[in-house]
Amino acid sequence: MAKKVAYPVILKPDQEGYYVEIPDFDIATEGDTIAEAMEMARDAIGLMGIDMEDEKKSLPEPNSKAQNVEAGDTVTLVDVDFTEYRKRVDNKAVKKNCTIPYWMSVEADKAGINYSRVLQDAISNILGLSLIHI
């Protein structure tokens, strides 16, 4: 799955600001200003995308659905980096069991090593990811 994608959105002015249709995901959101509406669209796409990823579903291709554009509407693209979005909003800690030699455990305990931090740093380094410590 591509992790950074730009999807078309349709901004429709209304009495309260802007209604935003996101055709590729069959969802909508809204915002008081154009900037807020676009940020809400990015958030909606991000949430939908990581939910789909968790459910092992494929993300829709950009422009995969017809757009219903009317006079006064604005069509633009909203980019979403799903990897960065997940790091920002889905940062809950999970327990993982690992096994190390006893002697290493003794030495690490003496040194006050934080096992969770070491494991996070090592995995991030191996995967080439920037890390947000939890």
Residue ranges of predicted features:
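Short, charged, surface-exposed hinge/linker loops at domain edges
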Residues: A2-A6, D43-T99, W103-A111, R117, ...
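Short aromatic-glycine-(Arg/Gly/Cys) micro-motifs in beta-strand/loop hairpins
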Residues: P8-D24
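A short, exposed loop/beta-hairpin motif centered on an aromatic-Gly-Thr core
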Residues: F25-A35, N97
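Phosphate-binding active sites in nucleotide-utilizing proteins
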Residues: L129
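Conserved small/polar residues in nucleotide/adenosyl-binding loops
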Residues: I132-I134
